[in-house]
């Protein structure tokens, strides 16, 4: 398997235009996804995770959101590379659903209520390959069976409201994978599901990835999911990457106060009972993510950070190299230990 990146993002800057001003939602973002690799994109709500994924798919609201700078290099199934930030909408339509698949958080909003499940899953084959409706339906039934939906042929003839939440999410995964994409973007795909179904969906995605060798960008706020499914993690805050590296290294040895705060905020089995006994509270990060229209000067995390010094408010820190594979956007990263 080639180790040339499937996705190579450099210097991505995404801007939203309002009546008053332009707001930078994603700033100077670099992400690489290799074949067969899962990279997790994590952070609180408002950190820029979903805007990054929508930028890759070129699904930003027209005339409001746009890519202002940077490149998004995709290596498609043909082996050829293309800069998604530079192509027109017609060329992008040929890539969406073909070379890139996407799974959204809420399947009921990504499935059309007036079309059957089978028709929706098979549609990318008809659009991108000119497959007949009958052949596309057969492929949809086969894939529904692969993603673990029982009685797949009958389910293919049903409508989204007739399926459970877990089945609908399996159907959206099937729709994203029907054309065998080289890259799958999963934007909070298990958040709306209960814990048992969530585990099943994660197992399914890992199984399908191992069979196809596709790369996956997994957007989530759940660090427990990251530990289970990803090899590398990218932590975002207020539109910028603040830490990135191998999951095991970042989780064992975080070098940014925000990452450390996220890890300490994770509840663990038995924590609630023990903490209640001792009269303690769950760890939280003080304050809120700042609005992108009113970012503080310097490091955006500084107002919430217990490590902050005067220099933190003066300028945005560069992404420093902790080692060859691990980076931190903190001027005091050498003093930080979990």
Curated annotation (Swiss-Prot):
Domain ABC transporter, first and last residues per copy: 10-263
GO terms under biological process: peptide transport; protein transport
EC number assigned by the record: 7.4.2.-
Classification via InterPro entries: AAA+_ATPase, ABC_Ni/Peptide_Import, ABC_transporter-like_ATP-bd, ABC_transporter-like_CS, Oligopep_ABC_C, P-loop_NTPase
Name the record gives this protein: Putative peptide import ATP-binding protein BMEII0863
Stored NCBIfam families: oligo_HPY (TIGR01727)
Binding positions for ATP per the UniProt entry: 43-50
Main localisation: membrane
GO MF annotation terms: ATP binding; ATP hydrolysis activity
GO cellular component, one term: plasma membrane
Keyword Cell membrane assigned: yes
Catalytic class of the enzyme: translocase
Location relative to the cell: Cell inner membrane
Superkingdom to which the source organism belongs: Bacteria
A Pfam family matched in the record: ABC_tran
Organism field: Brucella melitensis biotype 1 (strain ATCC 23456 / CCUG 17765 / NCTC 10094 / 16M)
Taxonomic lineage: Bacteria, Pseudomonadati, Pseudomonadota, Alphaproteobacteria, Hyphomicrobiales
């Amino acid at each position: 398997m080639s180790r040339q990146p499937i996705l190579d993002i450099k210097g991505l800057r995404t801007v939203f235009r309002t009546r008053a001003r332009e707001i930078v939602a994603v700033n100077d973002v670099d992400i690489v996804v290799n074949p067969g690799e899962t990279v997790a994109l994590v952070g609180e709500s408002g950190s820029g995770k979903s805007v990054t994924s929508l930028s890759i798919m070129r699904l930003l609201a027209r005339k409001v959101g746009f890519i202002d700078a940077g490149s998004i290099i995709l290596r498609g199934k043909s082996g050829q590379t293309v800069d998604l930030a530079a192509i027109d909408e017609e060329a992008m339509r040929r890539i969406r659903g073909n070379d890139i698949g996407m799974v959204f958080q809420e399947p009921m909003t990504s499935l059309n209520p007036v079309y059957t499940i089978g028709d929706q899953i098979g549609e990318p084959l008809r659009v991108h390959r000119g497959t007949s409706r009958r052949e596309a339906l057969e492929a949809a039934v086969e894939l529904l069976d692969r993603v673990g939906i029982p009685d797949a042929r009958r389910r293919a003839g049903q409508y989204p409201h007739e399926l459970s939440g877990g089945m609908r999410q399996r159907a959206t995964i099937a729709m994203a994978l029907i054309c065998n994409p080289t890259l799958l973007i999963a934007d909070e795909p298990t958040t709306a599901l209960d814990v048992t179904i969530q585990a099943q969906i994660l197992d399914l995605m890992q199984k399908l990835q191992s069979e196809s060798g596709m790369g996956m960008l997994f957007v989530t706020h759940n660090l427990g999911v990251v530990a289970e499914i990803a090899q590398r993690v990218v932590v975002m805050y207020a539109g910028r990457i603040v830490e990135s590296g191998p999951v095991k290294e970042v989780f064992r040895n975080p070098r940014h106060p925000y990452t450390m705060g996220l890890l300490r905020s994770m509840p663990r089995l038995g924590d609630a009972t023990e903490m209640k006994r001792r009269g303690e509270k769950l760890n939280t990060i003080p304050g809120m993510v700042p609005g992108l229209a009113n970012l503080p000067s310097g490091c955006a995390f500084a107002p919430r950070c217990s490590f902050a010094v005067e220099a933190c408010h003066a300028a945005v820190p560069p992404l420093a190299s902790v080692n060859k594979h691990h980076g931190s956007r903190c001027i005091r990263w050498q003093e930080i230990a979990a």
